[in-house]
Swiss-Prot record:
UniProt topological domain (Cytoplasmic) ranges: 1-309
Any GO CC annotation of this UniProt entry: endoplasmic reticulum membrane
Pfam entry (one): Syntaxin-18_N
Stretches with biased composition (Basic and acidic residues): 168-208
Disordered: annotated segments: 168-226
Vesicular side: 331-335
PROSITE patterns: SYNTAXIN (PS00914)
UniProt-annotated location(s): Endoplasmic reticulum membrane; Golgi apparatus membrane
Species annotation: Pongo abelii (Sumatran orangutan)
Quaternary state and interactors: Component of a SNARE complex consisting of STX18, USE1L, BNIP1/SEC20L, and SEC22B. RINT1/TIP20L and ZW10 are associated with the complex through interaction with BNIP1/SEC20L. Interacts directly with USE1L and BNIP1/SEC20L.
Descriptive protein name: Syntaxin-18
Phylogenetic classification of the source organism: Eukaryota, Metazoa, Chordata, Craniata, Vertebrata
């Protein structure tokens, strides 16, 4: 049984805060001002990324704890008939499947969003590597929780198939109903006789005439318990047919079990490939953004080169015109 340790946790947090505050005062009382400023600025890297990453890890951990807590009731197809505690209906199991899939999809989108923002922000190489490692760890944690959910779902589907197979193999209740109706008739006859006692006193001969055929049929029924050879052969053929049907059902169940296991394995592979494709799409997006920025810079350089080339042409034309005028002036002066 879980124990509430909230008060102990709060006391521990308060003790740690007091100790850190005391250490901060001791460091701040030093002579070196630059050292004091360094210690003051040290908590600055704790930003939005760390809090959001911790939040995603907390959500994934809650999902894992929830799946493990309700594992027995979730995978047990007979929990609603075995005990009143831990009862879970198929509707609740379907709701758990739907909520878990939505939750895992949301966590995956949050991880990809954190990865995109980490690539966009300008940080040192060490910070980028640290954030990439943190996101890889969170993604691996999510994959393990997805694998746990896939295994539980495969076990549940397998047990549901077994339950349906067993329900198909239950005997038909025709003989039981016939026996119950005959016993009810026999039990009701004394009560009717007791209720209709005044009428029977008036007509005893008629009642005896009615009861004698009933006793005769009862004795005939006892004699009919012995089966003839034709009936025995017919029942043996029916038994052989039922055995063949059960064997075919067992074979079908084994095939379905193999297919369910294969589907769960393919689902795990599909989930892993989808996460890999999301990471590749994100990296392609980053490359496209970088290529777009490079194209913009190249266009700016081309514009600057065109402007510089135009100015250079103007100076060349000016030089040629001045040279022409100088030659004309010298020719006129010489003549």
């Amino acid at each position: 049984m879980a124990v509430d340790i909230t008060l102990l946790f709060r006391a521990s947090v308060k003790t740690v805060k007091t100790r850190n505050k005391a250490l901060g005062v001791a460091v701040g009382g030093g002579v070196d001002g630059s050292r004091d400023e360094l210690f003051r600025r040290s908590p600055r890297p704790k930003g939005d990324f760390s809090s959001r990453a911790r939040e995603v890890i907390s959500h994934i951990g809650k999902l894992r704890d929830f799946l493990l807590e309700h594992r027995k009731d979730y995978i047990n197809a007979y929990s609603h008939t075995m005990s009143e505690y831990g009862r879970m209906t198929d509707t609740e199991r379907d709701q758990i499947d739907q909520d878990a899939q939505i939750f895992m999809r949301t966590c995956s989108e949050a991880i990809q969003q954190l990865r995109t923002e980490a690539h966009k922000e300008i940080h040192s190489q060490q910070v980028k590597e640290h954030r990439t490692a943190v996101l890889d760890f969170i993604e691996d944690y999510l994959k393990r929780v997805c694998k746990l959910y896939s295994e539980q779902r495969a076990i549940r589907v397998k047990r549901v198939v077994d339950k349906k197979r067993l329900s198909k193999l239950e005997p038909e209740p025709n003989t039981k109903t016939r026996e119950s109706t005959s016993s009810e008739k026999v039990s009701r006859s004394p009560s009717k006789d007791s209720e209709e006692n005044p009428a029977t006193e008036e007509r005893p001969e008629k009642i005896l005439a009615e009861t004698q055929p009933e006793l005769g049929t009862w004795g005939d029924g006892k004699g009919e318990d012995e089966l003839s050879p034709e009936e025995i052969q017919m029942f043996e053929q029916e038994n052989q047919r039922l055995i063949g049907e059960m064997n075919s059902l067992f074979d079908e169940v084994r095939q379905i079990e193999g297919r369910v296991v294969e589907i769960s394995r393919l689902q795990e592979i599909f989930t892993e490939k989808v996460l890999q494709q999301e990471a590749e799409i994100d990296s392609i997006h980053q490359l496209v953004v970088g290529a777009t920025e490079n194209i913009k810079e190249g266009n700016e350089d081309i514009r600057e080169a065109i402007k510089n080339n135009a100015g250079f042409r103007v100076w060349i034309l000016f030089f040629l015109v001045m040279c022409s005028f100088s030659l004309l002036f010298l020719d006129w002066y010489d003549s």
